[in-house]
Amino acid sequence: MRHKIKSRKLNVTSSHRQAMLANMAVALVTHEQIKTTLPKAKELRPYIETLITKAKKADLMVRRSVLSKIKDKTAVEKLINILGIRYKDRPGGYTRIIKAGFRYGDLAPIAYIEFVDRDINAKGNIQQDANEEIKN
């Protein structure tokens, strides 16, 4: 029976999964949009949303708690100083997942995960990325 099992295994060990989620969270905070597989995006969403909810308080205890999760000082600074202020009035739902088809090699479902109200200059436009993939 699958009682009280919340997360996906993603076919990796637990330490690998935690490191992968932390690295993906740093990439998402830095670029505000990343392209990954759909199960990884679905696992990243609650992980990053709890970090943003904590970052809205912006005190020393929160800074240390977030730094213990993602281990990148510049990402923590952006999370607390920019994203925490940006989503101060939003009660949740800071990210969206956009399905983007299937990967060519193994037909894995691909998705973009991005922040709602994101800074477009931080990464790029999804439509431009899709047009570049079609050209290549």
UniProtKB/Swiss-Prot annotation:
GO CC annotation, single: cytosolic large ribosomal subunit
**Alphabetized UniProt keyword annotations:** Ribonucleoprotein, Ribosomal protein
Q: Is-annotated flag, keyword Cell cycle?
A: no
A molecular function annotated in GO for this UniProt entry is: structural constituent of ribosome
Say yes or no: keyword NAD present: no
State the source organism's domain of life.
Answer: Bacteria
Gene Ontology terms describing biological process? translation
Similarity-based family: Belongs to the bacterial ribosomal protein bL17 family.
PANTHER family, sorted: LARGE RIBOSOMAL SUBUNIT PROTEIN BL17M (PTHR14413:SF16), RIBOSOMAL PROTEIN L17 (PTHR14413)
Assembly notes: Part of the 50S ribosomal subunit. Contacts protein L32.
Any idea what this protein is called? Large ribosomal subunit protein bL17
Q: Which gene encodes it?
A: rplQ
